[in-house]
A protein has these predicted regions:
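Ribosome large-subunit tunnel/peptidyl-transferase-proximal elements
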Residues: 1-104, 114, 132-143
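Hydrophobic, well-ordered secondary-structure segments
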Residues: 102-103, 107, 120
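C-terminal structural segments of small proteins and small subunits
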Residues: 110-132
Length: 143
């Protein structure tokens, strides 16, 4: 009987990808990012192995929301205290923390486990066009 094979742990050989979020629809962009973080495009994909790539997102403040989501989409934050639930619209979130819009969309597309928390540490989101990871020579993804 043949034993099932497991993909090797990538170690330091993870790839780096650069995505420009300018004028990209948020959900479609988040799918591409989540698939790169999970390595779902890899032929040796295994959901229990953290073998994904690093993803750098620039121009997060200029991501596009369709329909009336700019005014109607609701983000919540809870402090842990009574009456500590705060609500923010997408327009407010874009003004205060434009990186969190993309991070929360990608988080919603990942499994809720410890591997997903590790994957989220490999997501680097920047509000403007500059990023601090030029030394890694990221490969540009065009959407």
């Amino acid at each position: 009987m043949q034993k099932s094979t497991r993909p090797a742990n990538p170690g330091d050989s993870r790839k780096w990808f650069l995505v420009d979020a300018k004028d990209q629809v948020l959900g479609r962009l988040a799918v591409v990012i989540a698939n790169k973080l999970r390595a779902k495009d890899s032929p040796s994909f295994d959901p229990s192995v953290d073998a994904g790539a690093f993803v750098i997102v620039v121009n997060a403040a200029q991501v596009k929301l369709t329909g009336k989501k700019e005014q109607q989409k609701d983000y919540q934050r809870y402090s842990g205290y009574r009456d500590g639930l705060k609500h923010f619209t997408a327009a407010t979130m874009r003004r205060l923390h434009p990186d969190r819009i993309i991070k929360e969309a990608v988080w919603g597309m990942l499994p809720k486990n410890t591997i997903a928390r590790k994957m989220m540490t490999r997501l680097k989101v920047f509000a403007g066009p500059e990023h601090t990871h030029a030394a890694q020579k990221p490969e540009v993804i065009t959407l």
